[in-house]
């Protein structure tokens, strides 16, 4: 799973080397956090799948039967995709970003970042971005059978603090697509997608972070089919900032699919980050 930072846009008169170094340090720590989260999800999925395999053995379910159930799961998955409505078009907001001057920041943002995508054996596996010009992030992960996949990408914004004061940061995103999770009693599915907001200081260390879960379905003997057509999601954090210091605000989309036999899933979250609002010296 390759990770990378995209082309950066810098505020006027800013020290480009300083900001580039900040981006590199913070992104390195961001990836460590991603790897930790990935391990936790994989460990939880592995434990649940082992329980299902044990149940199959206890019930005497033989391989031919499992193959038949897997075939039925694939048919249900393909039927759900065929019925999915087409996502509506979202026009990017045509306003220039203030690049960390405070207030509401619209696209274009400072730079895109990509934590990478791992497709496993999924039949559908692609990213929508990341695109700092439009704020488009997210991925389309889907398929059937025993496999797993994940994607993590987003955009980022510079912020310069002029005083020692509390800072409130919020982001708003519109989501288009579909969340689908289906598993037979002998199958297993874990389908997950979220919106993340993370803040890093001038040393590249995380000082605040939060997650808003958009889609989360897991287990066996489960069926869920949810459509998104411009659904709005927000995330916000509060952090005490230091004077005369640069910060970098990351907004990301993390998507994950893990499947056992006789299961299908789709995490298709085409996400547009519409704004990042920054309020310093906020009351309360």
Regions found by a protein language model. Name each.
Residues 2-284:
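Mature extracytoplasmic or otherwise solvent-exposed domains
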């Amino acid at each position: 799973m390759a990770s990378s930072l995209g082309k950066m846009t810098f505020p006027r008169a800013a020290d480009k080397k300083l900001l580039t170094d900040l981006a590199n340090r913070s992104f390195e720590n961001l990836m460590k956090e991603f790897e930790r989260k990935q391990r936790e999800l994989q460990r939880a999925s592995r434990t649940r799948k082992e329980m299902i395999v044990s149940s199959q053995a206890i019930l005497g379910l033989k391989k031919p039967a499992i193959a038949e159930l897997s075939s039925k799961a694939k048919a249900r998955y393909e039927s759900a995709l065929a019925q999915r409505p087409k996502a509506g078009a979202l026009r990017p907001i045509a306003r220039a970003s203030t690049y960390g001057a405070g207030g509401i920041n619209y696209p274009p943002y400072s730079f895109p970042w990509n934590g990478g995508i791992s497709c496993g054996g999924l039949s559908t596996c692609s990213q929508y971005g990341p695109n700092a010009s439009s704020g488009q992030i997210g991925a389309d992960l889907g398929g059937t059978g025993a496999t797993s996949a994940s994607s993590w990408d987003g955009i980022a914004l510079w912020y310069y603090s002029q005083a020692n004061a509390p800072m409130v940061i919020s982001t708003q995103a519109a989501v288009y697509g579909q969340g689908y999770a289906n598993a037979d009693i002998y199958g297993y599915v874990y389908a997950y997608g979220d919106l993340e907001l993370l803040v890093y200081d001038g040393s590249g260390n995380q000082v605040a972070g939060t997650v808003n879960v958009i889609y989360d379905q897991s287990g066996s003997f489960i069926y869920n089919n949810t459509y998104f057509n411009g659904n709005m999601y927000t995330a916000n954090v509060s952090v005490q900032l230091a004077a005369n210091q640069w910060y970098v605000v990351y907004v990301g989309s993390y998507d994950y699919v893990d499947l056992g036999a006789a299961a299908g899933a789709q995490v298709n979250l085409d996400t547009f980050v519409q704004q990042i609002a920054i309020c310093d010296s906020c009351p309360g």
